[in-house]
Amino acid sequence: MLRKLLIGTALATSFAFSAHAADVKEVQMLHWWTSGGEAAALNVLKGDLAKEGFAWKDVPVAGGGGDAAMTALKAMVAAGNYPTASQMLGYTVLDYAAAGVMGDLTETAKKEGWDKSVPAALQKFSVYEGKWVAAPVNVHSVNWLWINKAVMDKIGGTEPKTFDDFVALLDKAKAAGVIPLALGGQNWQEATMFDSVVLSTGGPEFYKKAFNDLDDASLKSDTMKKSFDNLAKLVTYVDPNFSGRDWNLATAMVIKGDALVQVMGDWAKGEFHAAKKTPGTDFLCYRFPGTDGSVIYNSDMFGMFNVPDDRKAAQVALATATLSKSFQSAFNVVKGSVPARTDVPDTDFDACGKKGIADLKKANEGGTLFGSLAQGYGAPPAVANAYKDVVSKFVHGQIKTSDEAVTELVKAIDDAK
C-alpha cells in the first residue's frame, strides 16, 4: 500500500524538489524525540554537525511511538518534500526503500566500515537490496524494569526474578500506599509491556515463534492465553488515570516516587539522566522478571531520502556523524540506549548502560536477540499495528477474556499479513 502511494506521488512530484528544497548546508530532520531526555541526546548530534558547518532544521512530531511522525512523513514524501532524513523504525525503513524514495549511503558505508561494525540484526533493516539506506543510531531494549530506589527500600523490596516475584513486589507497593506500576495508556506502551510479558511467560523460543515468525500455533496457544492473563494481572496495579498518559510522564511518576516501577524500554533512562538521577543511588534497572539472558530490541534509524545532489553533502555529513564512535558513545550515554556499532567502548556508560551493552553482546552471541513486535522490529507495520490494537483493547476492557484476546490477535494478524 505504501509502495503504491509513494511511487505514484514520487513520479508526479519528481520535479518538485526545488520548490521544497532545504538549504544545501542544512540538515532537515523529522523525528519524535521531544521529551527532555530525548532532546538532550539529540543536541549532541546538532552540536557535532554545527562544527562541520551544517545547520539543523527540526521537524519534530510529538508522540513516543512515532505514529504521528510517520503520518507526517508520508504526507511530506507524497508531496515530494523529502527531508534529509527521518527517524524511523525497522520495517518502515524497508517499506520506504521498496517504494524507491530512499537514498544510497553505500559509498560512505564502505569507506567507514559499517559492514563490519554494525550488527547483522541492524543491517537487516538498514540495508535494502545491497544498498545502505539508513544509519542506525542506537540499540534500545524494551524488557526493562525502572524502579525508584527510595520506594523500593521503604517497602523492603528485592529484585524480582520471576513473574510471581514481581506480583509480590507490586503487592508490597500497593500495601504501602504507592502506585505500584506506572503506565501510559497508549497502545504502543501497552504492547511494549506485553512484549516482555510474552517473553517471560513463554520463554525465548516461544517469543521468537509467536512474535518474529508469526507462527499460528504459538499465537493460538495456551501459553499466549496465559500471557494475556499475566498482562491482565499487571493492569490491576495501574492507577485509574493512566489512559492516554505519555510515556515520559509515567517515567516521571517513578522519578518522583509517586510510583514504584515502570516497564519500559531503556529510553526511560534518558529521563532519569535528565533529572540528574544516578543508578544504584536513585533508581534501579532490572530485566523484566523471567527474561534475563534475552534482549527484545529496537533501533532508531535515520532513514536517508533521495535528495537532490546539492543536498547530499549534508546527508553524508549526518550519516558520518551518526555512526562515528565518539557520537555513538556520547549520544547513547544520554539517550539511555547502547551503541549501534560493536566497537564502541563502554567506558563512559553508567551501570545500567554497561549492563545493556553486556546483555546485548550475550544475546547476540546466544541467539536470544529478538525484534520487538510493538516497536516495529518483529514484523511489518500492518502486523505491528494490528497487534498493538488488540493488546490495547484488552487492557482497556473492550476485549474481556484471554480466550477472546487470542482469537482477536490471530484474526488481526492474519488480516494484516
From Swiss-Prot:
<keyword id="KW-0762">Sugar transport</keyword>
<comment type="similarity">
    <text>Belongs to the bacterial solute-binding protein 1 family.</text>
</comment>
<dbReference type="InterPro" id="IPR006059">
    <property type="entry name" value="SBP"/>
</dbReference>
<dbReference type="InterPro" id="IPR050490">
    <property type="entry name" value="Bact_solute-bd_prot1"/>
</dbReference>
<keyword id="KW-0732">Signal</keyword>
<dbReference type="GO" id="GO:0042597">
    <property type="term" value="C:periplasmic space"/>
</dbReference>
<comment type="function">
    <text>Part of a binding-protein-dependent transport system for a sugar.</text>
</comment>
<dbReference type="Pfam" id="PF01547">
    <property type="entry name" value="SBP_bac_1"/>
</dbReference>
<feature type="signal peptide">
    <location>
        <begin position="1"/>
        <end position="21"/>
    </location>
</feature>
<protein>
    <recommendedName>
        <fullName>Probable sugar-binding periplasmic protein</fullName>
    </recommendedName>
</protein>
<keyword id="KW-0574">Periplasm</keyword>
<keyword id="KW-0813">Transport</keyword>
